[in-house]
Amino acid sequence: MYLPKEKEIIQIKSYKHNGKLHRTWKKTVVLKSTENIIIGGNDHTLVVEADGRKWVTREPSICYFHSDYWFNVISMIREDGIYHYCNLGTPFAVDEQALKYIDYDLDIKVFPDGRFHLLDEGEYEQHRRQMKYPDSIDRILKTNVDVLSHWILDKKGPFSPDYIDIWYEKYKEYR
């Protein structure tokens, strides 16, 4: 498997279950790259939606991807604290073009005070019917919602107190 090197700039591409491109983040700096974990950082990066719409992120973010879990975490560094946006999706795959994953609609938003909410359940159910997600995928996603909830409550991985300090400092050094 191809692995990007630290300091390398990569794209992140999310797809839907039907194979269609969903969204592309144009520039993310690789901060850590192993077979199991890729951590990246970006700030004011161009994002292109599948329909061609474009927008630019507003704040620095640290992105966490794992090869064993069906979620990734985008930690947004804002003036009033750290917000985590967690996408339920496949473990990452990476090649010379981009880091890639399939987005399965469900998201968890974590607020600076630790509160969190599961989002987009209606969109998930609609796409589950339209794209015929297998029951096995549904079970995996529900299990990973539970795993992610425990990580948030236990302040594990990207939710640990030192995580942002360490990786944001490295991002500022690399960019």
UniProtKB/Swiss-Prot annotation:
The active site is at R23. SUPFAM superfamilies: FomD-like (SSF159234). This is Nucleoside triphosphate/diphosphate phosphatase. Belongs to the Ntdp family. Has nucleoside phosphatase activity towards nucleoside triphosphates and nucleoside diphosphates. Mg(2+) 1 binds at N87, D103, D107. One of its GO terms (molecular function) is nucleoside diphosphate phosphatase activity. NCBIfam families: PRK13662.1. HAMAP family: Ntdp. Its cofactor is Mg(2+). InterPro entries: DUF402, FomD-like_sf, Ntdp-like, SA1684. Mg(2+) 2 binds at D105, D107, D120, E123. Its EC number is 3.6.1.15, 3.6.1.6. Keywords: Hydrolase, Magnesium, Metal-binding. Pfam families: DUF402. It is an enzyme of class 3 (hydrolase). It catalyses: a ribonucleoside 5'-triphosphate + H2O = a ribonucleoside 5'-diphosphate + phosphate + H(+); a ribonucleoside 5'-diphosphate + H2O = a ribonucleoside 5'-phosphate + phosphate + H(+).
